[in-house]
């Protein structure tokens, strides 16, 4: 039996770095991923596709590992980086986008993430596992944003 957890997150923040510098990091998946916490391995699948293998986490007496793959596309003129899930890779489907806007004195960054995580748990565990999985993912994304903000010279 399995439990499916849906995750929808949105963030907006400003950094001191120039938009071109921000785009260069966020459009380079390995560079961007180096700021994401608890990544065990990032595997280049070719053609702009990457498989993310997260560190294993323990919840109660259960050990879980999130693995997913996404295909990335970027458009420098529009200041966008987006990714779509690759089905059949791992136990999650993750899509999202970055929108980078040059506001002269600062760079505005908007991050949106939609995910669906399938956990190998009995249905009765959903009430316990879903909020923990959501909170853990949200905590990692917030740490990722903090790490990127620091890399980009702090908040503007």
Question: Predicted regions span which residues?
Answer:
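Hydrophobic ligand-binding cavity/cleft-lining segments
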Residues: 1-49
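Intrinsic-disorder/low-complexity, polar/charged segments enriched in Ser/Thr/Lys/Arg/Asp/Glu/Gln
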Residues: 6-12, 49, 67-69, 93-95, ...
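Generic structural detector for well-ordered beta-strands
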Residues: 12-16, 43, 71-73, 82, ...
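Short strand-connecting beta-turns/loops that link adjacent beta-strands
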Residues: 18, 47, 77, 103-106
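Hydrophobic pocket/interface hotspot
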Residues: 22-26, 32, 50, 72, ...
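Hydrophobic/aromatic beta-strand elements that line small-molecule binding cavities or substrate pockets
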Residues: 39-40, 66-74, 94-102
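Glycine-rich portal/gate segments that line the openings of hydrophobic small-molecule binding cavities
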Residues: 44-89, 143-156
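Beta-strand/loop substructures that line and gate deep hydrophobic ligand-binding cavities in soluble
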Residues: 86-139
């Amino acid at each position: 039996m399995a439990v499916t957890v849906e995750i929808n997150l949105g963030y907006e923040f400003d950094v001191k770095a120039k938009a071109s510098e921000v785009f260069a990091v966020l459009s380079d998946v390995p560079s961007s991923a180096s700021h994401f916490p608890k990544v065990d391995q990032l595997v280049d699948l070719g053609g702009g596709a990457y498989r993310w293998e997260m560190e294993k986490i323990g919840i109660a007496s259960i050990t879980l590992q999130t693995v997913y793959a996404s295909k990335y596309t970027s458009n420098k003129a529009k200041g966008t980086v987006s990714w779509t899930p690759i089905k059949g890779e791992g136990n999650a489907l993750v899509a999202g986008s970055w929108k980078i806007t040059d506001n002269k004195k600062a760079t505005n960054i908007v991050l949106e993430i939609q995910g669906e995580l399938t956990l190998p748990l009995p249905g009765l565990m959903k009430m316990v596992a879903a909020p923990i999985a959501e909170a853990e993912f949200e905590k990692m994304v917030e740490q990722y944003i903090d790490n990127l903000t620091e890399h980009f010279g702090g908040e503007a």
